[in-house]
Amino acid sequence: MGSIGSMGKPIEGFLVAAIQFPVPIVNSRKDIDHNIESIIRTLHATKAGYPGVELIIFPEYSTQGLNTAKWLSEEFLLDVPGKETELYAKACKEAKVYGVFSIMERNPDSNKNPYNTAIIIDPQGEIILKYRKLFPWNPIEPWYPGDLGMPVCEGPGGSKLAVCICHDGMIPELAREAAYKGCNVYIRISGYSTQVNDQWILTNRSNAWHNLMYTVSVNLAGYDNVFYYFGEGQICNFDGTTLVQGHRNPWEIVTGEIYPKMADNARLSWGLENNIYNLGHRGYVAKPGGEHDAGLTYIKDLAAGKYKLPWEDHMKIKDGSIYGYPTTGGRFGK
């Protein structure tokens, strides 16, 4: 449910705060350091204003910004773990909260492009989840495709947390993967501009409904002299309804109460529309246990490495050249 300005911890759930961080204008490493200081200051201020909050979420690109002319340069990249994540860890430990942070991560393989990474830090200051974006926003983003799968970790109030990053949320199979591994609160951190505002709202709701899990999503807000970033933090119930919807204001704090046990109970007790179960047990009324092979061609082809669309040979954009990226692969933009 919506927090109605609640400041206390709910009895059987937890209070979450999603920060509509102003889109950073970043031109130097000093600007990144300033962003980190601002994020830490905001984390402490949010905890002071909402003493019962247990999870604070910052959007994609809030640490390093979106300067596309420099975002691949060594000056702009960070390591995970690294001294910057240690600062975030110290803040979470001091505030006694879980925190979600965005990092453009230097690839350990210097011959490959960087990763777009999200981390969850617990109240003890430990990184308990590290996720690398599986589906960069092609053809704009130059990030290397993630290699850590979709991890799930324990969170506050009986939650099992997973994080997706921006365009990942448009891939329904990824939300299903998180739920299949036990996630009941699916976090989405984004740096979208207004072109996909409606689709953002739609997919946050559909990811919740299709998988009987809460979704908590937050986007950058404000104007960076090129695009406007819409903010609109959103918390969705496991039945796909919107519990809380933010506005387009930079610095808006979107809060809500989440009860993971309710999602767990729905998964255990629902018959109608328990679709995450039905996928692997279709027709279980007529056939005891149901049919376990979903019979979906694209799943079989994907598993076999043969995924190909009927119109794929005629597609006009299949690389990053429209944005000036080379098409030869390998590390570029140093």
UniProtKB/Swiss-Prot annotation:
Protein name (database record): Formamidase
UniProt KW keywords: Hydrolase
Alphabetical list of Gene3D superfamilies matching this protein: Carbon-nitrogen hydrolase (3.60.110.10)
Organism: Helicobacter pylori (strain ATCC 700392 / 26695)
Activity modulation: Inhibited by iodoacetate. Appears to be regulated by the fur protein, but this effect is not mediated at the transcriptional level.
Assembly notes: Homotetramer.
Catalytic activity: formamide + H2O = formate + NH4(+)
Primary gene name: amiF
One Pfam family hit: CN_hydrolase
